[in-house]
Structure formats: C-alpha cells, structure tokens
Design a protein with these regions (language model features):
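Short glycine-rich phosphate-binding loop at a beta-alpha junction
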Residues: 1-3
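Acyl-thioester C-C bond-transforming condensing/cleaving domain
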Residues: 9-13, 20-21, 25-99
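Short beta-strand-loop/turn "lid" adjacent to the catalytic site in phosphate-handling enzymes
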Residues: 6
Length: 99
C-alpha cells in the first residue's frame, strides 16, 4: 500500500507500480494506493497494520512517495531515468486503452 497525493488518480497508480517494479517487486504482487492529503504515507502504514492485525495479510509493505512540505502543489517533474531500463515499468507509461 502506497500513499500518494500529488499526481492525478491514474498517475498515482502508475508511479507506485513503477516504484515497485524498480524495487524488484514482481508484478504478481498486488499494490494499491491511498490518498489522504498530507498523511497519505501514514494512512498506508496504518492500513497495512490494520490488515495484518485482522488477519487479511501475513506480511505487508507500506510507505509514501512524496513530501508535501518539499514539493510545490503543481509539481510537473520528470520520470525517473531508471524506467528506461525496465520494460515492465515502461509499460506503465502507456495510457489506458492504447497499444
């Protein structure tokens, strides 16, 4: 579970999947994002902890991908150059519905 707030909804999912792929996490591992404005990373951690406590997960990974304190509200940054070295991460950049 990854907390993210700055990108639009589809961009959040894409950036989190790319981060997982670049970290070596297989694409068979489920991933989802949460958006809780300035506490998205903390919400991700709380969600995983609650799911483990409830028995839904035996293990989980959670975190956040931005710092609201250090990013302007209209951030238009570039894509991590390492994406070019990972075919699976590159495929996340294709807009939905296009081949």
């Amino acid at each position: 579970v990854i907390g993210s707030v700055l990108g639009d909804s589809s961009q959040r999912a894409i950036q989190c999947r790319i981060a997982a792929l670049l970290a070596g996490i297989p694409d068979t591992v489920p991933l989802h994002t949460v958006n809780r404005q300035c506490s998205s990373g903390l919400q991700a951690i709380a969600s995983v902890a609650a799911a483990i406590k409830a028995g839904y997960y035996s293990i989980g990974l959670a975190g956040g991908v931005e710092s609201m304190s250090t990013n302007p509200m209209a951030w238009e940054g570039g894509i991590n150059p390492r994406v070019a070295d990972c075919d699976a991460a590159q495929s996340c950049l294709i807009p939905m519905g296009r081949c």
